[in-house]
């Protein structure tokens, strides 16, 4: 996500989609460079003065839509996990802490969810490739994924 660049037309289409009830989940972008690049792009769609980015704290309902999520897990890509001997932070100290953030509309409806410094979707994509990766990451990855998707569909 850190390399996303929206055209003027995409900015207008995405803003209209989100303002009409749409939901966007952004996952798998790591470190401050990718975060800053993403913030720059999403700010063209949803100006931060009107739509600030906020941390989703553990009292937010998204943490318990279907499953109780204690905290956002840090899930690496399977290739990084293998190369690094089981490390989870793909940018080392620059991405040591995963973040669960969101952007809400003026009524408090969550429009954008961002899972930064983690790759939740890799927990679903790679389950058949390595049994240990599956055991380490898929249960929590599926729990987060289902909570986010169900929250987006029901709010």
Label each PLM-derived region with a short phrase.
Residues 33-125, 142:
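An acidic, glycine-rich "communication" segment
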Residues 22, 46-50, 152:
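A generic secondary-structure signal for well-formed alpha-helical elements
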Residues 1-39, 44, 79-83, 115:
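Helical hinge/lid and interdomain linker segments adjacent to catalytic or ligand-binding clefts
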Residues 22, 111, 146:
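Residue-level detector of short, conserved catalytic/binding motifs and their immediate flanks
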Residues 123-155:
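Extracellular ligand-binding/catalytic regions of CAZymes and related secreted enzymes
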Residues 10, 60, 146:
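Solvent-exposed, flexible loop/coil residues
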Residues 15-18, 44-46, 72-75, 130-135:
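Short, low-complexity, polar/charged sequence segments that are solvent-exposed and flexible
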Residues 27-28, 119, 147:
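Acidic side chains
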